[in-house]
């Protein structure tokens, strides 16, 4: 913290920093704001701003110049309150305060400072938090010399531009790499898993019986609780329903329940989506989520996992299917090489899948790291307290 202050002190060179209420150092130009229903907007090239972003492009404008837009209500996040930068001609609706600095306050300095500020103490209301004009006017703003404001803006703008450039480059490069790796994975998957006359061909019903969990009634679920309950809409995603541990333990003992490593399959909606069951306590919607009870004497579960991605579920090309019935599932043919060869194939396909996933996960991570770098320096440069 000492180094942080020293860095800022070097910029200040002994100059004092005044704190002023926002309405003393900035203009609040809300009078021209005008909300327009989407059905009444005339399409054009002028950005139409709402609380969080540009909502449309219209003809006409309410403001022209450089302004900071602060959500009045409807901010997507209260912790990271919505602050936008508007330049040129634009249209502002009544969900944003429109502000620009007076002679002692650099507009971009105000923008960066507000993006680093905690707005929660200034908000009124619970269900739809609101920043009233009266509270906005009271927000304390640090006023270092304009030369210091300009230098801080120069540094933070450079970091913002670097983050944007890096995001664009990473997205372009990694998307191309992702497409290439995905195609490689699909090529080898098709080559290694398709029907081979040299291998034994069986039906999935020969691998093991089709299983599903016991039906869970709506009144047995809650929005929070002990055991996540996955429905077809949340399969492979975040659960939005839960069941009690008592019910889970009872049903787990009495009825079918997957083993760790079993491959769960979606039997409605998008047919054939898969999840490798990790063994964690959870429950799954009956008939919509099924699995083959596989003892792995004939087929490895991981081999099934990769096979399901190319399986033909008994429908014509271009056709649709509302449900994968057990009989359809059991009749799907699969080529099974010896277990040793299955291990080799799984090893190859796992590597391709890992490479593909590493790009998918790496892109947001790299962007997040760049954003954190900007936030670190923003905090360092704007911590006048």
From Swiss-Prot:
<keyword id="KW-0238">DNA-binding</keyword>
<dbReference type="InterPro" id="IPR051212">
    <property type="entry name" value="Type-I_RE_S_subunit"/>
</dbReference>
<dbReference type="GO" id="GO:0003677">
    <property type="term" value="F:DNA binding"/>
</dbReference>
<dbReference type="GO" id="GO:0009307">
    <property type="term" value="P:DNA restriction-modification system"/>
</dbReference>
<dbReference type="InterPro" id="IPR000055">
    <property type="entry name" value="Restrct_endonuc_typeI_TRD"/>
</dbReference>
<keyword id="KW-0677">Repeat</keyword>
<dbReference type="Pfam" id="PF01420">
    <property type="entry name" value="Methylase_S"/>
</dbReference>
<protein>
    <recommendedName>
        <fullName>Putative type I restriction enzyme specificity subunit S.HindORF215P</fullName>
    </recommendedName>
</protein>
<comment type="similarity">
    <text>Belongs to the type-I restriction system S methylase family.</text>
</comment>
<keyword id="KW-0680">Restriction system</keyword>
<dbReference type="InterPro" id="IPR044946">
    <property type="entry name" value="Restrct_endonuc_typeI_TRD_sf"/>
</dbReference>
<comment type="function">
    <text>A putative specificity subunit for a type I restriction enzyme; the corresponding endonuclease and methylase subunits have multiple frameshifts and are probably not expressed.</text>
</comment>
